[in-house]
Every structure is written in C-alpha cells, then in structure tokens.
Amino acid sequence: MASSMLSSAAVVTSPAQATMVAPFTGLKSSASFPVTRKANNDITSITSNGGRVSCMKVWPPIGKKKFETLSYLPDLTDVELAKEVDYLLRNKWIPCVEFELEHGFVYREHGNTPGYYDGRYWTMWKLPLFGCTDSAQVLKEVEECKKEYPGAFIRIIGFDNTRQVQCISFIAYKPPSFTDA
C-alpha cells in the first residue's frame, strides 16, 4: 500500500508534466502580416449583393393584409402548393388543414395585446393528417374544405409533434369575394 501511495505522489510532482503545454502568451499582432488593399471604389467589384439591394422593390405595406408565411407573394398555384406540402412532409411535420370564415388575417378584436381571440386560431378541418406521405392527400382535403365552405380562408400548417410547435403555416385558398385592399 505504501508503494502505491509513493508512486502516485511521484507522478503528480513530476516536472515533465508541468512543461507539456506552453503557457498562453497573448494574441499576435496583425501588424506583422503583409496586407495589400485594392484601392478601387467601384461597387461592381464588391463580392456581396449590397449595391444591388437598393434597386429591389418590396411589397407595398399600405392597404395589404398580412396573412401567414409567404403572404407577400401572389396566390400559390396547385403545383406550388404541392411543393410546399412536400417540403412540410420531408421535414417530418404533420400537415393540418384549417379554415376561417370571417377573418383570414391577424386582427385585434378584444384589446390591442396578443391573445386567444386575435385571429391566430382557426377552426381545424377534420383531424391532422398523421401518417400522411403524399401532398395529394393534403390538397384533396383542401378541395373538400373549399366545397364545404367556399367563402372561407383555408390554410395549411405543419406541426412538429416532437417539439410540439407549429413550424409552417401558409394560405392555401382565399375566397373569391376577398380583396387585398
């Protein structure tokens, strides 16, 4: 027992282990590195998009209703809807179809603070499509909802049942009577 205590003490106080790692001496100055700078003020030589961004228009904020994700885009076609649903399914999210008969956009009815009755909660069309693997199944449900409620806004949401959060939501159908203004 004495020999094991002696050997462990000898290992701890060994001077070879204290010099294995050099101490931190600080950061090196960047002055020692040669730097050549191009004195060109031509904006086209910059690698980023910074100069061209000012030329891009944005969606007009006045008189336009805010919906869900992709609301700044024109209405999605059936092919584009199918691609969005395919994206939702690839991410293993559960698709769900919801509809709203009066307000298809966020509004404040009972006060100015966010709450339950502020237009974010819609009526669910049937149950979520657990086990759905094809976007055609989801679009079929959207069509059924359109037939039942032709004057309703219809949206598709993607729910992550692992994290218990809604990950995506977008408008699939706006009623013909609706105008953006």
UniProtKB/Swiss-Prot annotation:
GO terms for biological process: photorespiration; reductive pentose-phosphate cycle. Keywords: Calvin cycle, Carbon dioxide fixation, Chloroplast, Photorespiration, Photosynthesis, Plastid, Transit peptide. SUPFAM superfamilies: RuBisCO, small subunit. The keyword Chloroplast applies. It is found in: Plastid, Chloroplast. InterPro entries: RuBisCO_ssu, RuBisCO_ssu_dom, RuBisCO_ssu_N, RuBisCO_ssu_sf. It comes from the Eukaryota. GO terms for cellular component: apoplast; chloroplast; chloroplast envelope; chloroplast stroma; plastid; thylakoid. GO terms for molecular function: mRNA binding; protein domain specific binding; ribulose-bisphosphate carboxylase activity. SMART domains: RuBisCO_small (SM00961). Belongs to the RuBisCO small chain family. RuBisCO catalyzes two reactions: the carboxylation of D-ribulose 1,5-bisphosphate, the primary event in carbon dioxide fixation, as well as the oxidative fragmentation of the pentose substrate. Both reactions occur simultaneously and in competition at the same active site. Although the small subunit is not catalytic it is essential for maximal activity. There are four genes coding for RBS in Arabidopsis thaliana. This is Ribulose bisphosphate carboxylase small subunit 1B, chloroplastic. The gene is RBCS-1B.
